[in-house]
Amino acid sequence: MNEILESLRSRLIVSVQALPGNPLRDTYCIAHLAAAAAAGGAAAIRANGVEDLTAIRKLVNLPIIAINKYAPSPTDPYITPDIEAARAIYGLGEIIAVDATKRPDFDRAAKLIAQIHEENDCLVMADISTLEEGIAAAKAGADIVATTLSGYTQYTVKTHGPDLDLIKALSDKVDVPVIAEGRFLTPEDVDKGLAAGAHSVVIGKMITNAMFITKEFIANSERLVK
């Protein structure tokens, strides 16, 4: 197995991102959140966009999963959806993650995976939402399949907590590492994801988004004043 992939086995990856409207949506903040995650024991960082990735690279000596997002959409691919988006982040991550959903069809994702491999020596991670998409991405040459988009396409259901069934099904059907991502909220969730066959687990806002965490505590407490 690739040395980077081996280093991620049964380890935690931290996704460090913030949307517009979040007070942490500042490249300085993002880079230092990534550094804090690294100091806490993260095995890798997932981050978005040229500016943030460049700043993180200066502070963090860990593998980076690089993405280049367009505006989020339930109907159109938006995570590094085309070769232009991928080229913009070449050299900024050991792994480039791409939207490998069937939107509009599997051919788009297959061509994108192949073209990145032709042009760059990075690993390619396929962010998918269904078992069918994961199998197709692995066949197309993806080095990793991730459950990132389960519940975030118009044809998948958003589960409460991680999609453990999808993680298990993928780990049984594909010959590449399965990285579990999406709605991991507790250490118990992480253990369940690894037990279901995940190679490693990505956690984002439950570690790096203070606004989200605050809202979660208030919303789920029976005694706090709303």
Report each predicted region and the residues it spans.
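Structural motif
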Residues: 47-48, 67, 99, 127, ...
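Glycine-enriched alpha-helix->loop->beta-strand junction motifs that scaffold or abut catalytic
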Residues: 41, 60-64, 91-95, 118-121, ...
